[in-house]
């Protein structure tokens, strides 16, 4: 069984999901069930794609350029310029050994933010998504919920401290705690308007 499926079995999976299949009802339980039924598999597929790359170099090339399994740019990075993505790729390629020896997701994420903070157009969502994709290859996943623009809106709607960089998954309402930290990030981003 693949590593991502092991993570899904233990903690749940995740997915970047745009769906026209709207949830019926707005209770947290209903929204979480909708996420699990409709959206979870999409990020699982994305992460499995990165997990199965033949080498870290290839995973880094695809992750830094935000290229999906169809050879297209991921939706979250669709507005980034090729110059920004290329600048990120060049910078990350120079420290490939440091990246692939990160022991946990936080270390990988922090290294990406440190390396890319001054690359024009590259922000916290790109750093998170790239760390998640590279982390899938390395078998390391977030233990905390990382906040960026979309997820901050969801955290704020739940009355949580949306000004933090990360939140402990244990502070979320019980239905949301059924999800893994990277699923919670995805859930907040997808359902932020339903949480208001």
Q: Which stretches of residues belong to each language-model region?
A:
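Helix-hairpin-helix/helix-loop-helix acidic hairpins
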Residues: 74-120
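C-terminal accessory module of base-excision DNA glycosylases/AP lyases that mediates lesion recognition
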Residues: 1-53, 108-109, 125-196
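Extended, charge-biased low-complexity segments
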Residues: 54-77
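Generic detector of intrinsically disordered, low-complexity, polar/charged segments
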Residues: 9-10, 22, 68, 84, ...
